[in-house]
């Protein structure tokens, strides 16, 4: 069993190149996999490993980056290691939006999962899913709307169209995208902006299914693909043709072929591409029979 730990922290960081090397070396030493993104504005990461190794790694990360606690964190379990390798990346922003976040100037507008239902049940509240469309399609909250933007940098264009007097309840996977979006709205003069504390993952971990207003599963950016209530690994897999999530229902379509295509990409792939993907899948299947992992195998479950 592996622990999966997601976290972020907005704090001015320096010596990024030096810290990248220190972090990378320690991840390798402790056999921790996943991705850590560092920028001048802070850190955003999801990493996974055995419990004791992960615990010491978390302590080491705080020491290297010089802070005592994270702004937000979540932990879940996985029967398999959901990441291929350890990666530490230096970026201009931990979440690309063209907006630098200063936590000192930010209001405390986080809504606890236990109070979230009451807020989004209010018909006057705009329930805003700040994730990408394909994530929204896997699962979302009751009454939510999605901006339908290709990347987060386009999000401000959508936000500019909203009424400043309308209460807005935003949510995303772990909370970090909403941190930036809420700062943007506050700077634009919006007064009633709220965000789900700890994001969807925190909600699914703490709210029982019978009390939940969440429909579907939550897409995650690792080889679990999706999680359900209790942060149990979900039922989705990933299409090798287009890298979009595929549900058990999608797999019943004639357009679905394991390792080749799904309902999202079948009509857009050329015959040459499909033949290439079939050959790749054949190699993966042969590797599985011998108990080894093929270089092109993207999923572990």
From Swiss-Prot:
Record PANTHER family: RHODANESE-LIKE DOMAIN-CONTAINING PROTEIN 7-RELATED, THIOSULFATE SULFURTRANSFERASE/RHODANESE-LIKE DOMAIN-CONTAINING PROTEIN 2
Lineage per the UniProt record: Bacteria, Pseudomonadati, Pseudomonadota, Alphaproteobacteria, Candidatus Pelagibacterales
Positions of the catalytic residues: 172 (cysteine persulfide intermediate)
Function: Catalyzes oxygen-dependent 5-hydroxyuridine (ho5U) modification at position 34 in tRNAs.
Entry keyword set: Oxidoreductase, tRNA processing
The UniProt record lists the keyword DNA-binding: no
Rhodanese domain segment(s): 121-212
Organism, as annotated: Pelagibacter ubique (strain HTCC1062)
Protein name: tRNA uridine(34) hydroxylase
Family (UniProt): Belongs to the TrhO family.
């Amino acid at each position: 069993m592996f622990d999966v730990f997601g976290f972020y922290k907005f704090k001015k960081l320096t010596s990024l190149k030096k810290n990248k090397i220190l972090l990378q070396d320690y991840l390798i030493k402790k056999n921790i996999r996943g991705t850590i993104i560092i920028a001048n504005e802070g850190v955003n990461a999801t990493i996974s490993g055995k419990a004791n190794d992960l615990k010491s790694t978390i302590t080491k990360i705080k020491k290297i980056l010089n802070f005592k606690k994270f702004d937000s964190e979540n932990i879940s379990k996985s029967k398999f290691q959901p990441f291929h390798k350890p990666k530490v990346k230096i970026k201009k922003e931990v979440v690309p939006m063209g907006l630098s976040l200063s936590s000192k100037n930010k209001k405390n507008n986080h809504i606890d999962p236990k109070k979230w239902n009451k807020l989004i049940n209010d018909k006057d509240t705009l329930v805003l899913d700040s994730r990408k469309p394909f994530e929204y399609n896997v699962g979302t909250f009751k009454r939510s709307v999605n901006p339908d933007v290709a990347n987060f940098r386009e999000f401000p264009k959508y936000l500019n169209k909203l009424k400043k007097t309308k209460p807005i309840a935003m949510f995303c996977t772990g909370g970090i995208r909403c941190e930036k979006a809420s700062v943007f709205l506050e700077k634009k003069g919006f007064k009633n902006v709220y965000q789900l504390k700890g994001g969807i993952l925190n909600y699914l971990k703490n709210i029982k299914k019978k009390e939940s207003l969440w429909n579907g599963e939550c897409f995650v950016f690792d080889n679990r693909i999706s999680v359900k209530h209790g942060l149990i690994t979900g039922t989705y897999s990933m299409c090798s043709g287009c890298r979009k999530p595929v549900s058990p229902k999608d797999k019943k379509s004639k357009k679905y072929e394991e390792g080749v295509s799904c309902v999202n990409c079948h009509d857009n792939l050329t015959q040459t591409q499909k033949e290439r993907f079939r050959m790749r899948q054949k190699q993966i299947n042969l590797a599985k029979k011998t108990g080894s992992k093929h270089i092109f195998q993207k999923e572990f479950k």
